[in-house]
């Protein structure tokens, strides 16, 4: 039976152990007899967490979309084009896309995995909360570079906002280009940003934060701190 939206009490430490065991036994023969345990320990509390987070975001006016049925990624891997045929992910994540005012109230701008928004990762040894613009298409990446060239003060103001720096330090990238764009001098003060293939930020979460019933507030606090960068990235258009 699914946990109701009002009953998130923190993840059971056994949920962390389950994911560690899954990483060591990533096959259907191990998982299928334990599927009900996965649902009880991880899936159902995850849905309850996202439901409570949705309430926190709305109350605090943080324009990120949290939906218990849509925000959480599936545990099953798509192995069709991968040499790794392991059937299950060894982490579980949830994304919370950026919203803007529309004709019917706030609406999701880009609900794809490559849009601007927040993210929560549940994985033994890799618990974290963060956000940004993950691996955007070429047009948005070029728009980001134009913003750096045309209005560096606006970019700097977002990246150096004290609350953001206190929570996350700085933005980073999963991957970078080896070379700068040909029209950017090597001594440009934001040359490092020009090499970014995406723009992300995050902070690690301790296990006792993840097992706490205050986790929805912890995530909402993190997303609030990330607003200067998320708002800036929301203005980036191809």
Label for each model-derived stretch:
Residues 8-26, 99-108:
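Short, charged low-complexity linear motifs
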Residues 20-78:
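Active-site acidic/histidine clusters and adjacent loop/turn architecture
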Residues 59-88, 92, 167-181:
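A short, surface-exposed loop/turn module that caps and links secondary-structure elements
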